[in-house]
Amino acid sequence: LNLKALLAVAKKIL
């Protein structure tokens, strides 16, 4: 997992 993918998921949750 890279940071960009993690941020994309976090944005969807938030």
Swiss-Prot record:
The modification Leucine amide is found at L14. Keywords: Amidation, G-protein coupled receptor impairing toxin, Mast cell degranulation, Secreted, Toxin. GO terms for molecular function: toxin activity. It is found in: Secreted. InterPro entries: Mastoparan. One of its GO terms (cellular component) is extracellular region. Expressed by the venom gland. Its main location: secreted. Mast cell degranulating peptide. Causes hemolysis of guinea pig erythrocytes. Its mast cell degranulation activity may be related to the activation of G-protein coupled receptors in mast cells as well as interaction with other proteins located in cell endosomal membranes in the mast cells. Belongs to the MCD family. Mastoparan subfamily. This is Mastoparan-C. It comes from Vespa crabro. The lineage of its organism: Eukaryota, Metazoa, Ecdysozoa, Arthropoda, Hexapoda.
